[in-house]
Amino acid sequence: WMGIAMALMAYSKYHGALVVLFIVLSNLRLLKNPKFYVACLLTLALIAPHLWWQYQHDWISFRYHLDGRTRDFEYSFVTEYLLNLFAIFNPFLFPVFLKGWWKTKGHTPVLRALNCISAGFILFFLASTTRGYVQPQWEIPATFGVIAVLYLFTQGRERLRRYIVRVGWITIALIALVRIEMIFNPLGLKFEVFDNRASYNEIAAAADGRPVIFDGSYTDAAKYGFYTGRTAYAQPSIRYRTSQYELKDDDDRMAGKPAILQVWDLSLIHISEPTRH
């Protein structure tokens, strides 16, 4: 089962390798266990199709993650990372976690692994800020260790336990309110995430059934397809990363057919007249 779990983590997110690494570091005796190597071989067999695909496409996503995201260092990478860290793990609970992690000892292999995963992810991505911006969601695997530490640290500390329970209920209520706003937008906020459906439906109406070619933005093409169910394509750009649209045959299928070219210019949307592509 360990081999299957490691393979599923690899398919889900490459950061799954960090989970395995930190588990091994928390219990080096695994390196003396033959079953661990059998699990690794099973993992390798299960991800072999993905590795073969990577080989056929010049290791495209590996190269992107190892080098394509590298940018000149900015202090804002560190400050934003720390702010996001507090926001993700709750600014009212994260200080408690830090104190609990320092005082709580892992008395079992599982607890040691959870402690190592939580600290390892936080420190690893803190170091990664020297190479570029770190996405907040990359820290999610550390959540399991944070929860375990908070639970253990509150044992025998009734006052602290009541504090965490209260903060937890308040947090759940706030998350529910944010979710309601994101789904229904009763406040009429103009943030991009709240206005996607209307703006992309506007483009779809102008396209009138024709495919839409987005100028260099694979995210806009993907969101257009999601919100409208219509055909979209992202024109490759030498100034931006490689996307899945460069691996598909959309340009061949759309050749010679009428299409709409969409270009973002600040807050304005310019839609060209139908042309032959």
Regions found by a protein language model. Name each.
Residues 44, 105-128:
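Transmembrane alpha-helix segments characteristic
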Residues 87-108:
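Hydrophobic, aromatic-rich transmembrane alpha-helices
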Residues 155-185:
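Signature aromatic-anchored transmembrane alpha helix within multi-pass, membrane-resident enzymes
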